[in-house]
């Protein structure tokens, strides 16, 4: 992993982990260690792939579509990891993941 990729991963973790972990705790799906582990785990899976493919993007729409795929993958993984069962909870989790990814993407575009 390049130094730039590590900086981008650190930024992503710094923004998304507190948001998603806090949400999981407030929803009472998991305790603090599980909330942090899940939030870190999904980002360690998705971020390197997104970072690698995004270097070749020529359009902002490519980034938007790639982020949509990341949100879907992270939501599915967190639903499984945290044993989220209710459909409404799954939708709510997806919205939290959208918010976290939007925040980290916006910050990344501003500072990197």
Predicted regions mapped to residue ranges:
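Juxtamembrane/disordered regions of integral membrane proteins
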Residues: 1-112
